[in-house]
UniProtKB/Swiss-Prot annotation:
Family to which this protein belongs: Belongs to the amidase family. GatA subfamily.
Catalytic site positions: 79 (charge relay system), 154 (charge relay system), 178 (acyl-ester intermediate)
Top EC class for this record: ligase
SUPFAM superfamilies per UniProt: Amidase signature (AS) enzymes (SSF75304)
Any GO MF annotation of the entry: glutaminyl-tRNA synthase (glutamine-hydrolyzing) activity
EC annotation from Swiss-Prot or TrEMBL: 6.3.5.7
Gene Ontology CC annotation, any one: glutamyl-tRNA(Gln) amidotransferase complex
Coiled coil regions, renumbered to chain: none
Origin superkingdom: Bacteria
Protein name, per record: Glutamyl-tRNA(Gln) amidotransferase subunit A
InterPro entries to which the protein is assigned, alphabetical: Amidase, Amidase_dom, AS_sf, GatA
Designated gene of the protein: gatA
Length: 494
């Protein structure tokens, strides 16, 4: 079985037709992890025994002629900030080393209901704070297209696992681009749905008004399938919408004739790599040839989204991460004098530099004397940006931009330049600020590295995203190109 090119929906058909057993699929993916993950570092934990046991149980269901779930027998990886019962949930942080989740997140419950199987937990930036997965306190992850480069972040391990054939599908979280940016860097499809489309129950909170669980897949149909399976209302997350979930994977169409697509000029200005710009412009021409009506538009306030985002996200992080105090659970310093010292030293030793930087920033902007000048103004800017996006979505079915201003950058290239790292999210954070859905799909290659095309639409219009993405995908070959991980001519220092 060619794990690099076969899709989840094709795998399910093969299982249904008894061309392959679930156990064979599980063993093939485990062999793939053994083969390449020592180089890539996608996984923090692989549930080998549990995967094989579940696979055997599912094979028995087939032999009994039982009805198969939508994700029957499909190996799925899960970012290590989403709870899976009896598996670790470390957020790639020393603070949570050894923590085992006693329950399933809502999305994991849904995966199990549809009979998908969890292969393991993937690496990430610590507490989802980062854009390269370099902030993991546990291990370094590498881009499967070039082992000297980052996979993006914070859901870097999830993107790697799909791009490298180590999982058929993956679940991640997106607070400012953490699914779409690594999807772009690794050449896969990544969706951040509308805020409230998918329950966040069981996901460790970073920025509660920004966080959203989303999906990563090798192609649009797989992404649509996983999204429809895990979406829906959850009473344990009051932000979820009580709305019917469309059958996204069954309504895909290449026909986008007459669809109005806007091209915001602010996304094509200074800072965008010329070769990336060319790839995105060529992608826009494909959509035009497929019948879409293309028109330039303007969202002038979008340039303030990044600044507003980092103020709001840091403020929410400083509140959410206060629970990690070395007393209730998690890492506890052994060198302390009293209760206050436990708190101070446990957080100082257990949290990484980027996490501490954002906690300090968040505490600062929420403090007396600065609340009005920073946090309150950021909330006002957020509202104005949201209003502009809502207005633009009345005119267009979708708007298109690059996912990132560059392709994947080299390991350590931006680690010490915080602002340069933050700017890699400049095109993705507006979707989180506003809550609209956005998807990244492969649209080209630049110097051997994937380029991502970002498509955004109005609230709960994921079906439009999937159709525009599917139309482009069916007219091009970019989604079918896979990395050659076995090349040995690269000095990647392992």
């Amino acid at each position: 079985m060619n794990y690099m090119t076969i899709t989840a929906h094709k795998l399910k058909d093969m299982i249904k037709n008894r061309e392959i057993s679930v156990e064979e699929i599980a063993r093939t993916y485990l062999d793939r992890v053994d083969e390449v993950d020592g180089k890539l570092g996608a996984y923090l934990y692989v549930a080998s025994e549990g995967l094989l046991q579940k696979a055997k149980e599912l094979d028995k269901k087939i032999s009994r002629g039982e009805i198969l779930g939508k994700l029957f027998g499909i190996p799925i990886s899960v970012k290590d900030n989403i709870s899976v019962e009896n598996m670790q949930n470390t957020c790639a942080s020393r603070m949570l080393t050894g923590y085992i989740s006693p329950y399933d997140a809502h999305v994991v419950e849904k995966i199990k209901f549809h009979q998908g199987i969890i292969i393991g937990k993937t690496n990430m930036d610590e507490f989802a704070m980062g854009s390269s997965t370099e902030n993991s306190s546990i291990k370094l992850s590498r881009n499967p297209w070039d082992l000297n480069r980052v996979p993006g972040g914070s859901s870097g391990g999830s993107a790697i696992s799909v791009a490298a054939g180590e999982a058929a599908l993956s679940i991640g979280t997106d607070t400012g681009g953490s699914i779409r940016q690594p999807a772009s860097f690794c050449g896969v499809v990544g969706l951040k749905p509308t805020y409230g489309r998918i329950s966040r129950y069981g996901a460790v909170a970073f920025g509660s008004t920004l966080d959203q669980i989303g999906t990563i897949a090798a192609d649009v149909e797989d992404c649509a399938l996983l999204t429809e399976c895990i979406s829906g209302m959850d009473k344990r997350d009051f932000t979820t919408a009580d709305m019917e979930v469309p059958k996204y994977s069954k309504s895909l169409s290449k026909d986008i004739k007459g669809m109005r697509i806007g091209i915001p000029k602010e996304y094509f200005g200074e800072g965008l790599n010329d070769k990336v710009r060319k790839s995105v412009e060529e992608a826009i021409l494909v959509l035009k040839e497929n019948g879409a009506q293309i028109k330039e538009c303007s969202i002038p306030l979008s340039e303030y989204a990044l600044a507003a985002y980092y103020i709001i996200a840091s403020a929410e992080a400083s509140s959410n991460l206060a629970r990690f105090d070395g007393i209730r659970y998690g890492y506890r310093s052994k060198n302390f004098k009293d209760a206050v010292d436990i708190y101070f030293k446990s957080r100082s030793e257990g949290l990484g530099s980027e996490v501490k930087r954002r906690i300090v920033l968040g505490t600062y902007v929420l403090s007396e004397g600065y609340y009005d000048d920073y946090y309150k103004k950021a909330l006002k800017v957020r509202k104005l940006i949201r209003n502009q996006f809502e207005d633009i979505m009345k005119e267009f079915h979708a708007i298109i931009s690059p996912t990132c201003p560059t392709t994947a950058f080299k390991i350590d290239e931006k680690k010490e330049d915080v602002m340069a790292m933050y700017l890699s999210d400049i095109y993705t954070v507006p979707a989180n600020i506003t809550g609209i859905p956005a998807i990244s799909i492969p649209c080209g290659m630049v110097d051997g590295l994937p380029v991502g095309l970002q498509i955004m639409s109005g609230y709960f219009r994921e079906n439009i995203l999937f159709n525009v993405a599917y139309s482009f995908e069916q007219s091009t070959k970019w989604h079918s190109i896979t990395p050659d991980i076995q090349k040995e001519d690269r000095n990647y220092g392992i």
